[in-house]
From Swiss-Prot:
Subcellular location: Cell membrane
Keywords recorded for this protein, A-Z: Cell membrane, Disulfide bond, G-protein coupled receptor, Glycoprotein, Membrane, Olfaction, Receptor, Sensory transduction, Transducer, Transmembrane, Transmembrane helix
Family under the similarity heading: Belongs to the G-protein coupled receptor 1 family.
Positions on the Cytoplasmic side per record topology: 77-84, 151-169, 248-267, 323-340
PROSITE patterns assigned: G_PROTEIN_RECEP_F1_2 (PS50262)
Gene Ontology biological process terms, A to Z: G protein-coupled receptor signaling pathway; sensory perception of smell
Role noted for this protein: Odorant receptor.
CC per GO annotation: plasma membrane
Primary residence: membrane
Keyword Glycoprotein applies: yes
Lineage, opening ranks: Eukaryota, Metazoa, Chordata, Craniata, Vertebrata
Annotated TM spans: 56-76, 85-105, 130-150, 170-190, 227-247, 268-288, 302-322
UniProt-recorded name of the protein: Olfactory receptor 5T3
Xref: SUPFAM superfamilies: Family A G protein-coupled receptor-like
Length: 340
């Protein structure tokens, strides 16, 4: 009986020893998960602690934001209300204006609050949501600008068949595909970025949650994330810019065949406006993302990010409408109705 009891105790001791080994082995996997949940919020430090400068920046960016909303949403209303603007070219322009309004709204309100608030924190989920929307709208705009370039080519190459060539069966899928591409691209980066461990500093040297500064503060190996960022952003930039350039080349060939000076001027104006918008937008994206996240530290980088998230959405209505006679006529007509 004693020997049986002793054997039973030895068996229990062996089981306990093996369970302890298994538990210590699982700790290897538990610790990274624990580290990931240590940071529950981030601090958006911005680029200045000077209160007087922050007040000035608040007033400046608040004014820019108001102009952005008025310009872009006003253009959307204009396209909806004016029957002369009911064609694919202006539908694309209204979608771009809506995107710019959303793009700016994702970033600007939180930034304005942080200029005057002592607590500049943003929750983990809030940061992920802001980044998801920001990348979605940004990527969608890249593809939409490419679709608009193709639309301009169709309009200039054969204007008589434009309404047939660019029917709802064509332009609606182009717009939808742009949004789908934006959502997929954003989802990939959100999953990759927020699967990392953030167990050290929670201070993001930025005015909003963006990928490079987040990767810079992660305590995980971010090599894969940086490759994803480089290859995905690089591929999207190459594809969309090529579509724009090829479309513009065909537009120029079509312009050279035109006999009407008025037609040439209108075509040059349309193509020139679009190239200006594309160059400014894609140029700032390339500067911001096509380099290692470790080099992301200077105020210059923050200013570039602010430019393409806040300033460009304000400029787009001016770029695409300033030399557009149809839009000018529609604006004058609406102002007459308002002040009649």
């Amino acid at each position: 009986m004693d020997s049986t009891f002793t054997g039973y105790n030895l068996y229990n001791l062996q089981v306990k020893t093996e369970m302890d080994k298994l538990s210590s082995g699982l700790d290897i996997y538990r610790n990274p998960l624990k580290n990931k949940t240590e940071v529950t919020m981030f601090i958006l430090t911005g680029f200045t602690d000077d209160f007087e400068l922050q007040v000035f920046l608040f007033l400046l960016f608040f004014a820019i934001y108001l102009f952005t909303l008025i310009g872009n949403l006003g253009l959307v209303v204009l396209v909806i209300e004016d029957s002369w603007l009911h064609n694919p070219m202006y539908y694309f322009l209204s979608v771009l204006s809506f995107l710019d309004a959303c793009y700016s709204t994702v970033v600007t309100p939180k930034m304005l609050v942080n200029f005057l608030a002592k607590n500049k924190s943003i929750s983990f989920i809030g940061c992920a949501t802001q980044m998801l929307l920001f990348v979605t709208f940004g990527t969608t705009e890249c593809f939409l600008l490419a679709a608009m370039a193709y639309d301009h080519y169709v309009a200039i190459y054969n204007p008589l068949l434009y309404s047939v060539s660019m029917s709802p069966r064509v332009y609606v899928p182009l717009i939808t595909a742009s949004y789908v591409a934006g959502i997929l691209h954003a989802t990939i980066h959100i999953v990759a970025t927020f699967s990392l461990s953030f167990c050290g500093s929670n201070e993001i040297r930025h005015v909003f949650c963006d990928m490079p500064p987040l990767l810079a503060i992660s305590c995980s190996d971010t090599h894969t994330n940086q490759l994803l960022l480089f290859y995905f952003v690089g591929s999207i930039e190459i594809v969309t810019i090529l579509i724009v350039l090829i479309s513009c080349d065909f537009i120029l060939l079509s312009i050279l065949k035109m006999h009407s000076a008025k037609g040439r001027q209108k075509a040059f104006s349309t193509c020139g406006s679009h190239l200006t918008g594309v160059t400014i937008y894609h140029g700032t994206i390339l500067v911001s993302y096509m380099r290692p996240s470790s080099s992301y530290a200077s105020d210059h980088d923050i200013i570039v990010s602010i430019f393409y998230t806040i300033v460009i959405p304000k400029l787009n209505p001016i770029i695409y409408s300033l030399r557009n006679k149809e839009v000018k006529k529609a604006v004058k007509k609406m102002l007459k109705l308002v002040y009649k």
